[in-house]
């Protein structure tokens, strides 16, 4: 069975901006993307993709043993919600698995789990929204995780070869 997820990411948060904004929203945010410099790293940017199944995602980031504490400085945080269906635990797990399995080849990912792709057809569509303006982010910094993550990620069975293939579309363009 095929699964389709539309993810709406809000971002370019700094940690101190996130909680107040999140409280003011009606949506439940289940996923997050973090980029920054790891302790003792001068230039290299590292990334972390995670899930939170709490009322407030920002509470998860405040956990004492969370990976956010591995960063000496945070470049950005994006928080995401699945907008085309009520996200159940298995949906959040599947989306996190797709994101980490794609991104592990792209950058310095701190995640140590979920590096293998799922065994079903999955379609992910990512929308990037500027949290202050509530409008689409048309330009992001080159090293932004929102710029590195494709807008569309498709993982599906190639029936001719009888194996799964990964398809991506980096940035969708508006047509006139």
Language-model segments: which ranges?
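Boundary/linker segments flanking structured domains
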Residues: 1-47, 51-176
